[in-house]
Amino acid sequence: MVRSFNFLNFIFLVIIFGCGDSESESSNDIVIPEESDSTWNLIWNEEFSGQELDNSKWNILRWRPGWVNNELQAYTNRDTNLYFKDGCLVIRALVEPGYFDEDYLGNSYNSDYTSGRINTAGKFNKTYGRYDIRAKLPKGRGSWPAIWMLGENISTDGWPYCGEIDIMEHVGYEDDIIHGSIHTETFNHNLNTQKSGSK
């Protein structure tokens, strides 16, 4: 069965896409490889070159703590967690003891941690293609930046039946390791049968 994915139902989970502003980070130089194959046709791109997210491409998610993966942080739509700096989109996690807000359903919550989360659900999907992504990741225990693709049928079939491709996940305490996984009805982390690789 072929599934169409919400490409860039990239769920950017914790800290940074593009650039960062931590003193402990390495060089801000980004090397852009030369295009080696001209047989591809560009059908969608996002350079994050403006001053705000393009609402025709992106959704900003507002979720209370625990909504996804039992995570401690709340996902906000505030410019302290999601902003542009030096031509890059920054998604930043913060420690904010006593933070109070409402989720997208209007339910109140408290959280000591906040972050940003965006996706393209309902705005872009593609079954096949090549996806080039450039991101700078944080290091540090507790961070978990990730870029995922989920099946566009997630709202009707649920996970893992919709399928998931983890393009990149970085567990903060594993300094130089990036993980990629595929989750399906048969192969998923609930059954401990997911298909994964690390580099």
Language model feature labels by segment:
Residues 3-12:
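Sec-dependent signal peptide recognition
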Residues 2, 20-25:
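Intrinsically disordered, low-complexity segments
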